Structure formats: structure tokens, C-alpha cells
């Protein structure tokens, strides 16, 4: 794909939908392993749990969130995307707040479950489903462009978090 072809595709595609996809894949990072792993050591230290215990809690919460995603994810087919996206953002906000307040193993499980469901699951799902619903002919281009959001987050978010943690 040439630079000209890449940028010219925006003339035929809805830039708003691609930006929506980019933003949602970017912020899905809050529920992605690379992001949550940044807090692994401090959580284990705070709760006095081992790597294995943390891993078991993480795996169980992730598995449960994937099963729940099947049920919640299909709601996007019957709901206005703006409304669905609003609910997902609210859930991610609540999840992030709860994640910042982890004080027990049970709370850790709930927080990871909600972060994985809302961030990694529903944010990604909303982005991909919206792009797939809106685009027919250039679906692949639109999806690949919107998924640059996650790649960008994988670079930006760890640097940002490590920088912000220096102030604590």
C-alpha cells in the first residue's frame, strides 16, 4: 500500500468511525495484559500474594469475563452504538476506579474481571463491530487503521504510567 493510497482511503471512508475505532482500541489498553501487568508487583506486595496466586486470580477473572462477553457482546446488535459505547465507557470508568482501590483478594478478582470485560473485551468488541457494521468494501483497511489505536497504546501507556508513578 502506497502512502497516497493509504491517505486517499479516508476520502472514501468515514473518518469519524475510524477515529471512534482508534480511540476505543487505544483505551481498551486499560484491560489489556500489558497494562494491568504494570501493577502486578505492587498488588502482590500489598495483598501479600505470590506470582502463582496472582496468575490464578488473573486467569480466572479473564476466563469469566470472556464468557460474560459472549452474553453482553451480543447486545450491540440490538442497541444504538452510541448508547452501547456510553455504557462501555461508564463501565470502564467504574472498573478503573475499583482497580485503584484493591484491598483484598476478592476485590482483586472483581476489579480484574471488570477491567478485562470492559477494557480488553467490550472496548475492542465495540470498535471492531462498529467498523465491521459500517464498512463493506474497505472493511479490512478500516479495521487495520482503527487497530493502530492498540499499537499506539502499547507504546504510550506504559511510558505514561511509569512517568506518573514517579510522582507517587
Feature-to-residue mapping (PLM):
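Interfacial helix-cap and linker-helix signal at transmembrane-aqueous boundaries
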Residues: 43-44, 75-77, 160-168
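Cytosolic juxtamembrane N-terminal segment immediately preceding the first transmembrane helix
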Residues: 2-24
Amino acid at each position: 500500500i502506497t502512502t497516497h493510497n493509504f491517505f486517499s482511503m479516508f476520502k472514501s471512508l468515514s473518518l469519524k468511525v475510524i477515529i471512534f475505532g482508534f480511540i476505543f482500541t487505544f483505551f481498551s489498553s486499560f484491560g489489556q495484559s500489558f497494562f494491568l501487568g504494570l501493577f502486578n508487583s505492587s498488588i502482590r506486595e500489598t495483598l501479600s500474594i505470590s506470582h502463582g496466586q496472582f496468575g490464578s486470580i488473573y486467569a480466572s477473572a479473564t476466563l469469566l469475563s470472556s464468557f460474560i462477553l459472549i452474553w453482553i457482546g451480543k447486545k450491540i446488535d440490538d442497541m444504538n452504538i452510541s448508547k452501547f459505547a456510553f455504557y462501555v465507557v461508564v463501565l470502564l470508568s467504574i472498573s478503573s476506579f475499583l482497580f485503584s482501590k484493591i484491598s483484598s483478594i476478592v476485590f482483586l478478582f472483581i476489579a480484574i474481571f471488570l477491567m478485562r470485560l470492559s477494557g480488553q473485551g467490550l472496548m475492542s468488541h465495540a470498535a471492531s463491530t462498529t467498523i465491521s457494521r459500517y464498512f463493506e468494501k474497505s472493511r479490512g483497511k478500516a479495521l487495520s487503521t482503527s487497530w493502530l489505536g492498540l499499537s499506539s497504546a502499547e507504546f504510550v501507556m506504559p511510558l505514561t504510567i511509569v512517568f506518573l508513578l514517579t510522582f507517587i
